[in-house]
Amino acid sequence: MSDKKQKGLEWQDNPLSDNERLKEESNHLRGTILDDLEDGLTGGFKGDNFQLIRFHGMYEQDDRDIRAERQEEKLEPRKFMLLRCRLPGGIIKPEQWIEIDKFARDNNYYQSIRLTNRQTFQYHGVPKTKLQDMHRLLHKLGLDSIATASDMNRNVLCSSNPVESELHQEAYEWAKKISEHLLPRTNGYLDVWISGKKVQSSDSFLGQEDEPILGNRYLPRKYKTAVVLPPLNDVDLYSNDMNFVGIKDEKTGKLAGFNVLVGGGLSFEHGNTKTYPNIALELGYVPVEDTLKAAESIVTTQRDFGNRADRKNARLRYTIQNMTLEGFREEVERRMGRRFEAIRPFEFTERGDRIGWVKGIDKKWHLTCFIESGRLVDKPDLPLMTGMLELAKVHKGDFRITANQNIIIANVAEEDKRQIEDIARQYGLIRKITKLRENAMSCVSFPTCPLAMAESERVLPEFIDELDKIMAKHHVEQDYIVTRITGCPNGCGRAMLAEIGLVGKAVGRYNLHLGGNIAGTRIPRLYKENITLDEILSELDGLIARWATERDQGEGFGDFVLRVGIIKPVVNPVVDFWDENLIPTVAV
């Protein structure tokens, strides 16, 4: 018998990462979290629990603005938790929102709510002493935060298209079904946060807590899923591990099935050429009745073949690289018990939200409110958080958080439209903004993210102000360029699908990437490395001047810089993302 490893499993020759031990020894994700909750000597979690709380939807953070000051005073960092709610499709009820708002005001260090591009909300700054209260509140509201972080299938995205209301409802139901189907089966979340019950690993019922899909070591790495309805790519489909592109049956008007695309992901590590961003690849088409079986088969293939030795190469895109796309498809088909059909034709033309009012085919109105970087907080001149609360008090429909960090006041009856608009205008939820700002995005970064290398959310408004001036200077202010800033290369701001992407390198310095496109189907290439925001604006001034005068009719900025040779396209990131021969040494 040959000892040769099955293709894709060569990583098994190396020691497993310590995270694999942690998961296996975690008592089905319980760890000793309850003991840490009783420890008042520290505001954080110790040992394995620091990682385990991520499976419950939380990250331990601290205020980096005052970290050095507290260190000088011999104090531990001001520790607190980020919580990310599980909210497949981003739909939330006004009565739920009122309670979510109250908790943020009463218990959140920053007194804000952050809408994320994973189509949910986050709390930043929740002290350890309030964590059980927070989870019990979510439970009372019919919500939870299980599996919104760490090595699981995270919050499932779904197109927020309010116009085709019946089709959207179908897509939303599938997003919920996929989310529920891929959840962990353990009761650990409920035991720790709701009942506060300590369960020992020897307890007999633990043997029944089987994880038939995720396994007892769960997935090798984070896993992101989206459901999308063309032609609007409002979930940034190509950035996700697993994607379901809804195909409409033209006879019935209902969903016939899904094109399945896999292996997207935008994170990489500065200087590590074994890491790279990539767009999702076409796997095949499945009829709607086989959706869950396809999802499960893809996930279990990643579970069994994904790299558990090197977490930097553990995402699905690396598994596909190791197995080859054809090899991966064959393994998924074997588990699924059927072959994929040929991809059905589809096209994406844009991906931003439709800011303002739109009317659905069901005659209901939907108001999309622009929320810069998703931050709902009350500022003296812009009390957005209170505005949302006031809307929640009177709105009879629902809210939909979008994957572009905005929020839709959905299902407004004709007779209620004026009241909703008046409140939204009063609190700045309707205001004049440029198309450039509408299509900009940032991650949180400083002061709460421990991975941040440079500012992101806090510099985006001023950066867009300056870029708007450049656009006006060159008479292209009616157009827009998809612009995104992320504070480190982990990719939370999705800069690796932008026409202009800034990736934090050090405090005040960024790598500038150019050449993505409006539809979000292309990775931008590194153009300038380790430069300041002022230097970036200077570079963009010259490039936008050329775009304004030399572009073809309707040509986007990202397409233009490729066509005229300012930047070379990223054709296959596995091969050419890091190719130094393709990176400009001087501006063209």
UniProtKB/Swiss-Prot annotation:
<protein>
    <recommendedName>
        <fullName>Sulfite reductase [NADPH] hemoprotein beta-component</fullName>
        <ecNumber>1.8.1.2</ecNumber>
    </recommendedName>
</protein>
<dbReference type="InterPro" id="IPR045169">
    <property type="entry name" value="NO2/SO3_Rdtase_4Fe4S_prot"/>
</dbReference>
<comment type="function">
    <text>Component of the sulfite reductase complex that catalyzes the 6-electron reduction of sulfite to sulfide. This is one of several activities required for the biosynthesis of L-cysteine from sulfate.</text>
</comment>
<dbReference type="GO" id="GO:0009337">
    <property type="term" value="C:sulfite reductase complex (NADPH)"/>
</dbReference>
<keyword id="KW-0408">Iron</keyword>
<dbReference type="InterPro" id="IPR005117">
    <property type="entry name" value="NiRdtase/SiRdtase_haem-b_fer"/>
</dbReference>
<keyword id="KW-0004">4Fe-4S</keyword>
<comment type="subunit">
    <text>Alpha(8)-beta(8). The alpha component is a flavoprotein, the beta component is a hemoprotein.</text>
</comment>
<keyword id="KW-0198">Cysteine biosynthesis</keyword>
<feature type="binding site">
    <location>
        <position position="492"/>
    </location>
    <ligand>
        <name>[4Fe-4S] cluster</name>
    </ligand>
</feature>
<feature type="compositionally biased region" description="Basic and acidic residues">
    <location>
        <begin position="1"/>
        <end position="10"/>
    </location>
</feature>
<keyword id="KW-0411">Iron-sulfur</keyword>
<dbReference type="GO" id="GO:0046872">
    <property type="term" value="F:metal ion binding"/>
</dbReference>
<dbReference type="GO" id="GO:0000103">
    <property type="term" value="P:sulfate assimilation"/>
</dbReference>
<feature type="binding site">
    <location>
        <position position="449"/>
    </location>
    <ligand>
        <name>[4Fe-4S] cluster</name>
    </ligand>
</feature>
<dbReference type="InterPro" id="IPR006067">
    <property type="entry name" value="NO2/SO3_Rdtase_4Fe4S_dom"/>
</dbReference>
<dbReference type="InterPro" id="IPR011786">
    <property type="entry name" value="CysI"/>
</dbReference>
<dbReference type="GO" id="GO:0051539">
    <property type="term" value="F:4 iron, 4 sulfur cluster binding"/>
</dbReference>
<keyword id="KW-0349">Heme</keyword>
<dbReference type="GO" id="GO:0004783">
    <property type="term" value="F:sulfite reductase (NADPH) activity"/>
</dbReference>
<keyword id="KW-0479">Metal-binding</keyword>
<dbReference type="GO" id="GO:0070814">
    <property type="term" value="P:hydrogen sulfide biosynthetic process"/>
</dbReference>
<keyword id="KW-0521">NADP</keyword>
<dbReference type="Pfam" id="PF03460">
    <property type="entry name" value="NIR_SIR_ferr"/>
</dbReference>
<dbReference type="GO" id="GO:0050311">
    <property type="term" value="F:sulfite reductase (ferredoxin) activity"/>
</dbReference>
<dbReference type="GO" id="GO:0020037">
    <property type="term" value="F:heme binding"/>
</dbReference>
<feature type="binding site">
    <location>
        <position position="488"/>
    </location>
    <ligand>
        <name>[4Fe-4S] cluster</name>
    </ligand>
</feature>
<dbReference type="InterPro" id="IPR006066">
    <property type="entry name" value="NO2/SO3_Rdtase_FeS/sirohaem_BS"/>
</dbReference>
<dbReference type="GO" id="GO:0050661">
    <property type="term" value="F:NADP binding"/>
</dbReference>
<dbReference type="InterPro" id="IPR045854">
    <property type="entry name" value="NO2/SO3_Rdtase_4Fe4S_sf"/>
</dbReference>
<comment type="similarity">
    <text>Belongs to the nitrite and sulfite reductase 4Fe-4S domain family.</text>
</comment>
<keyword id="KW-0560">Oxidoreductase</keyword>
<dbReference type="GO" id="GO:0019344">
    <property type="term" value="P:cysteine biosynthetic process"/>
</dbReference>
<comment type="pathway">
    <text>Sulfur metabolism; hydrogen sulfide biosynthesis; hydrogen sulfide from sulfite (NADPH route): step 1/1.</text>
</comment>
<keyword id="KW-0028">Amino-acid biosynthesis</keyword>
<feature type="binding site">
    <location>
        <position position="443"/>
    </location>
    <ligand>
        <name>[4Fe-4S] cluster</name>
    </ligand>
</feature>
<feature type="binding site" description="axial binding residue">
    <location>
        <position position="492"/>
    </location>
    <ligand>
        <name>siroheme</name>
    </ligand>
</feature>
<feature type="region of interest" description="Disordered">
    <location>
        <begin position="1"/>
        <end position="20"/>
    </location>
</feature>
<dbReference type="Pfam" id="PF01077">
    <property type="entry name" value="NIR_SIR"/>
</dbReference>
<dbReference type="InterPro" id="IPR036136">
    <property type="entry name" value="Nit/Sulf_reduc_fer-like_dom_sf"/>
</dbReference>
